[in-house]
Amino acid sequence: MNIIDRFEQENISKRTANKKIPDFEAGDTVKVTVKIIDRSIEKDGKEKLTERFQAYEGVVIAKRNRGITSSFLVRKISHGEGVERRFMTYSPIVHSIDVVKYGVVCRAKLYYLRNRSGKSARIKERHIPIAKTKAAKA
């Protein structure tokens, strides 16, 4: 293992120390909670920073596993328009990742969903036995 790989592994372990990243893949529906920092200037000229959390729920259409620069692309339909957002897996901005539904797909990248709407854009649900999910949570 060279120096760069060791540095990446140390960084990944530091960033995942206080949060758990579940196993998910393309086709799964995830809920990503993101930390948003709002900056405003008060009347007296002082700068005020406020933090809030925002949830983004959608289907993972691509996942890129590249060490510390790993990312995944989530697509959702908002007010009739398709919205895609790429999240860095180990970013400090990503507060939590929860898998809502597991999907069954035969592709690693689901870019074809961009051209589909309605029933043709649906993904079959993969059912996982209750014993496995309870053991994973414990």
Curated annotation (Swiss-Prot):
Annotated GO biological process: translation
Entry keyword annotation includes Cytoplasm: no
Keywords: Ribonucleoprotein, Ribosomal protein
Function: This protein is located at the 30S-50S ribosomal subunit interface and may play a role in the structure and function of the aminoacyl-tRNA binding site.
One GO cellular component, as annotated: cytosolic large ribosomal subunit
Keyword Repeat set for record: no
Similarity comment text for this entry: Belongs to the bacterial ribosomal protein bL19 family.
One Pfam family in the UniProt entry: Ribosomal_L19
Record organism: Rickettsia africae (strain ESF-5)
Family matches, as HAMAP family: Ribosomal_bL19
GO MF annotations in UniProt: structural constituent of ribosome
Domain of life: Bacteria
Protein name as it appears in the record: Large ribosomal subunit protein bL19
